[in-house]
Amino acid sequence: MTEDDRIKLEPSWKHALRDQFEQPYMAQLREFLRQEHAAGKEIYPPGPLIFNALNSTPLDKVKVVILGQDPYHGPGQAHGLCFSVQPGVPAPPSLVNIYKELKRDLNIDIPNHGYLQSWADQGVLMLNTTMTVERANANAHAGKGWQFFTDRIIEVVSEHQPHLVFLLWGAHAQGKQKLIDATKHLVLTSVHPSPLSAYRGFLGCGHFSRTNKFLEQNGETPINWVLPPA
């Protein structure tokens, strides 16, 4: 069995990203994570959920891409989808502001949970550009190699799909614009939904209705942003 065979990854992504698992950065990233585990550090999300964004949204099903920075670093929060938390965990402040904008934009009632899996299941690729984090230590895994992998994911989906919407909230996400073919995709930008910045343009951005309008104009089914009970 090769190393590649042991990677639990949805087949379309596994094929599209196959060469990345042979790159030197990936070996270095694997060794870094092994050493962190050996040192007794708690890593989020749990191993089987690290690739949840890819496993939930196959490459040819992607309609929308939302970019986050790194996973939530509190116990029980992260499950591999940016901005989302596991059932039973209160919605973090940035997600609360996302809900506020959904209410303003589409009159969607604010849910009592923060589990966004249904968006991923409909074709929203919810990708953190750094895919792991150490407990209680935000950005601890930034610069360790994930950035090369997730940059390639952005390039692949931009190349592969005909009419996507990219939602780039905050300076970090907007730094990835160079990877996106803006001649065929809709790229929507705003400040981050964090309480520190949301009032400077995220609240009022209308990104959710604009996303669905673009999808419908291009013959795609719009996203149902209403979340089912978790």
UniProtKB/Swiss-Prot annotation:
Q: Which Pfam families match?
A: UDG
Q: Which UniProt keywords apply?
A: Cytoplasm, DNA damage, DNA repair, Hydrolase
What reaction gets catalysed by this protein?
Answer: Hydrolyzes single-stranded DNA or mismatched double-stranded DNA and polynucleotides, releasing free uracil
List the InterPro entries.
UDG_fam1, Ura-DNA_Glyclase_AS, Uracil-DNA_glycosylase-like, Uracil-DNA_glycosylase-like_sf
Where does the source fall among the domains of life?
Bacteria
Per the record's keyword annotation, is DNA repair included, yes or no?
yes
Entry annotation: catalytic residues: D70 (proton acceptor)
Keyword Disulfide bond in the entry? The reply is: no
- The enzyme class is hydrolase
Gene Ontology CC terms: cytoplasm
Enzyme Commission number(s) of this protein: 3.2.2.27
GO molecular-function annotation terms? uracil DNA N-glycosylase activity
Example GO BP:
base-excision repair, AP site formation via deaminated base removal
Annotated HAMAP family: UDG (MF_00148)
Q: What is this protein called?
A: Uracil-DNA glycosylase
Q: What gene is this protein translated from?
A: ung
